[in-house]
Amino acid sequence: KNKINKIVEFGAGLGRDSVFFAKNLIHTIALDYSKAGISIIDQKIKKQNLTKYLSTKLFDVRKKLPFKDNSVEACYSHMLYCMALNNQDLQNLNDEILRILKPGGINIYTVRHTDDGDYENGIFRGEDLYENDGFIVHYFSKEKIYSLLNGFSNILIENFDEGSFPRKLFYVANMKNVINQ
């Protein structure tokens, strides 16, 4: 709808969504913390001849994002915000996304929410973080989503289910304000 030509995916994992974007002729930069994940995406790029539309970068999103100010049309992440990131990490990431997005740019992300069946199960690690089977998940309320809107306008928050459990998620779309403070 917004005719996005270039997108950055944070927490690309094994590249499912990055490959989808590239196959739909959207120039995609896939960032992930895992060398193994990046290696798998690189193999998919070669095997599926996607070098024109998809590139990768090994990167920790807790650091300053490797892009110039106001240079990116759209950012996307599927459950990255649910990783073991505390509220300050999330605010820093969101501030960095705000910095790199062009005015009117879109940040789309998905998060597990507080109606999820695993919420409040396992070991409480603070800030709506729960550890289950050695894996920490950060759960979101709508209030937490709204708290990350500084410099953004919310376009959409939509509930959806994923998997057979199913996981309960929010799909969030925010637009960078054209004029920021």
Describe the residue ranges of each PLM region:
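A short, conserved alpha-helix within the catalytic core of class I
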Residues: 84-96
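Short glycine-rich, flexible loops that bind phosphorylated cofactors or substrates
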Residues: 83-84, 116
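Class I (Rossmann-like) S-adenosyl-L-methionine-dependent methyltransferase catalytic domain
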Residues: 1-54, 58-63, 92, 107-177, ...
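A short acidic, Gly/Pro-enriched loop at the edge of an enzyme's catalytic core
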Residues: 62-75
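Short amphipathic alpha-helices and their capping/turn segments at secondary-structure boundaries
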Residues: 65, 94-99
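A short beta-strand submotif of the Rossmann-like class I SAM-dependent methyltransferase core
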Residues: 77-80
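Activation segment
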Residues: 65-66, 84-85, 149
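Short glycine-dipeptide loop
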Residues: 101-106
